[in-house]
Swiss-Prot record:
Protein name per UniProt: Fatty acid oxidation complex subunit alpha
Protein keywords: Cytoplasm, Fatty acid metabolism, Isomerase, Lipid degradation, Lipid metabolism, Lyase, Multifunctional enzyme, NAD, Oxidoreductase
InterPro entries per UniProt: 3-OHacyl-CoA_DH_NAD-bd, 3HC_DH_C, 6-PGluconate_DH-like_C_sf, ClpP/crotonase-like_dom_sf, Enoyl-CoA_hydra/iso, FA_oxidation_alpha_subunit, FadJ, NAD(P)-bd_dom_sf
Source organism superkingdom: Bacteria
Pathway(s) of this molecule: Lipid metabolism; fatty acid beta-oxidation
GO biological process, one term: fatty acid beta-oxidation
Protein's organism: Shewanella sp. (strain ANA-3)
Annotated region described as 3-hydroxyacyl-CoA dehydrogenase, given as residue ranges: 308-709
PANTHER family: TRIFUNCTIONAL ENZYME SUBUNIT ALPHA, TRIFUNCTIONAL ENZYME SUBUNIT ALPHA, MITOCHONDRIAL
Amino acid sequence: MEKTFNLTRREDGIAILMMDVPGETMNTLKAEFGPEISEILSEIKRDSSIRGLVLISGKKDSFVAGADISMLDACQTAGDAKALSQQGHVVFNELEALNIPVVAAIHGACLGGGLELALACHQRVCSDDGKTMLGVPEVQLGLLPGGGGTQRLPRLVGITTALDMMLTGKQIRPKQALKMGLVNDVVPQTILLQTAVEMALAGKRTAKPVKKSLVNQLLEGTGFGRNIIFDQAAKQVVKKTQGNYPAPAKIIDCVRQGMAKGMQKGLEVEASHFAELVVSKESEALRSIFFATTEMKKETGAEGATPRKVKKAVILGGGLMGGGIASVTTTKAKIPARVKDINEKGLSNALSYAYKLLDKGVKRRHMTPAVRDNLMALMTTTTEYKGVKDADIVVEAVFEDLALKHQMVKDIERECGEHTIFASNTSSLPIGQIAQAASRPENVIGLHYFSPVEKMPLVEVIAHAKTSPETIATTVAFARKQGKTPIVVQDGAGFYVNRILALYMNEAAQLLLEGQSIEHLDKALVKFGFPVGPITLLDEVGIDVGAKIAPILEKELGERFKAPAAFDKLLSDDRKGRKNGKGFYQYAAGNKASSKKKAVDESVYAVLGIKPGMDKDLSAVAERCVVQMLNEAVRCLDDGIIASPRDGDIGAIFGIGFPPFLGGPFHYIDTLGADNLVNILERYQAQYGDRFEPCPRLKAMAAEKARFF
């Protein structure tokens, strides 16, 4: 049986401990490694010829990417999870207690348990490579660093910096890591091992303390000051999470207790809190998302199909969406993109959009001006169909006009090769209707991005009846290269995301017309766990956009999608939302919010002919909106729009910000119980009408006490 850890001795007395998990592309820490590491550490202690130890990875591009998350699912109880954390403590304490210098030589991902392993070493040196990132992202899985990270990190880099890392899960680049004292040196990968050996030979066992500002010294150096830091962090956590995520508060408590009562007490608290989080419903939901997205990365989107390589892309339309799509194509996928627009202004906008995004990277020192300029060189523009013949994929991002899109299809089929894919970014028009203009309908597909393109992770890949499996697979692979999470959905009005969002938004509108205030509505859904409330979202998306989509959905899917007629009054009053600085909220010049907390434009109530002040309980308001979304998500599964509950969960979380700690609509239905959800829907149906009628599948599941997972 192949070993994961291999110890070799050099003539100069330095031992190299190489970690290389057999058969895996990245190193992850597993429970079964404990005895193996302990045995090696005992061997090192017995050998007096060993003067120092260097820990390095045998993998090409990763140090240790973290702990193997599947270990946690094997934990039947909190006691099992606590034992797992304690085992890590024993091994890392043993490593730290070695009486010879121990140096971690880091190249590639050094995350979670990987960073905790490095923290147990006496010094750290990392490569200056772009692939090298350090961090403790456990909070993103509803967990905390359970291998001593909550104790060693604040002692190394300071409480404020450590809390920032642990509460956000942010990843740190090499130069930043050096500046903050997380590593002792940053060197080219070619001399990484040599440098680590020299550090071990130098015999230093402790790192030089990082220089702190006077304010930080005063705050972190006294019990009173530390309490200010912890109290402030706790307030920020509640504000950001609405109390929906238990991990951040437990991270703060681990650090607070460890700094007040010592390392040993801190480790005890860490193990207990880690165990509580492992078995929490929030972490289970967040881990399900992690496993789902990992699983999806292995799929092509069309069984048995092999994607073609995309070497060149063309984007039709230089507007906000077109510019964003071109930008992620060049900067993320590193694929040349040619933007075609009917006028120079559109092209100028697309170039400016891409440049501003890249220049932000330069200002934040994530890239050099030369890298920015090289990426910009991948984007070219044209007002005619020149330089488009060899395109492998054309992404159309023009106005939502079927005749215009038909013309685009004909133009591309005339100007490009037989294999060229035509991908429409339509948000509402069925792809089958767009493909009616095509002589090669098998090449036509939907590729629905969400705005702003560079920030929103989801894309819907929409196959119509004649789309070929190869077209689907190629489009999915293209979207992944752009850094997106694609879900394949079938053709139909609203596809999946906009369809479930529409009923949620309509219900919020009904509540507004019944007298719920705008602030109350938004507050209710933010407290429930959405990133923004429905009224804020409508302002952001555009009231006019919502008005265009609603009739299409109503025509194709029925009366339940009918938008409140009162909203026509908003358009008559020229209220489009943030885009024209006139919507539900007030906007200052330049369409920027007038303050951090936006103020409601009170005049909107008069336009709608309503009087606010009938505010109901926050949870009741949220429930009415959310159950509409849940019911429609199940309908989409029944209609074959989505292939599985897993895809439905990922689409809702990454497309509209459905609360991740609930695991997605289908996981949440399992938590509620289909029978409970049916009862809630039937209660609302009796009060408000048939738009709340539970779909047949939900009723059947309720009768059988069935689950999705």
